[in-house]
Amino acid sequence: MKNLVRVVSCVLLVAMLSVAVFADSFTASVTQKDAPAVTKTAEVVAADGSKVEVKASDIKVESVAAKSIAPEAKAELDKAYDVIVKAGSLEKAVPELKTVLKEAKIDVPVANLVVRDLVNVSVPEDVVKALETEGTTITVSFKLDVKEGTTVVVMRFVDGKWVPLALENVTVNKDGSVDVKLDGVGPIAFLVENK
């Protein structure tokens, strides 16, 4: 009986510690809510300045909570999620966040940021190929319903690690949407200040 109590106690302790790590790095709903919609036509800009539009309906955004997501995308999202959880905090998972905030003169400690949305972004194959060319970007507008003036940090999961975007590539609009200039697609995390 004592051994059973010890085992149950250990399981409960591990569960409580996992919840604490989760609570520090993610909003409670990140694994339960739908992905934000794309609000308008996206624009691909090549290094030479040429532009191509991509219809919003051709951009697929799927949340970590999505039920019908391609197995490869789900595996990559799960891996991206686990990197933050296993590190124990955003500061440990993405040390570059501090530098990004400092360069943008944003006075928000990394410890105060949480992931509010974790999604996979996919585009048609011709756009994927275009983004492989150095200097080519796509600007996508996501319906996040955040207030103008809110600090929104965006990270992209690249080669097994999170890479924060320079804040000059993220624009919060008056309508609550957020324009993000990306140099690739795949898992994307939106971070906001935990208030």
List each language-model region with its residue ranges.
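Sec-dependent N-terminal signal peptides of Gram-positive bacterial secreted proteins and lipoproteins
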Residues: 2-24
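Sterically constrained small-residue positions within well-ordered secondary structures
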Residues: 14, 35, 45, 74, ...
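Proteolytic processing hotspots in large secreted/extracellular or virion-associated proteins
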Residues: 24-29, 102-153, 158
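Short, polar/proline-rich extracytoplasmic segments that appear immediately after membrane translocation
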Residues: 24-57
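Self-processing/autoproteolytic domain segments and adjacent N-terminal interaction modules in large
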Residues: 51, 55-131
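Proteolytic-maturation and junctional protease-sensitive modules
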Residues: 129-193
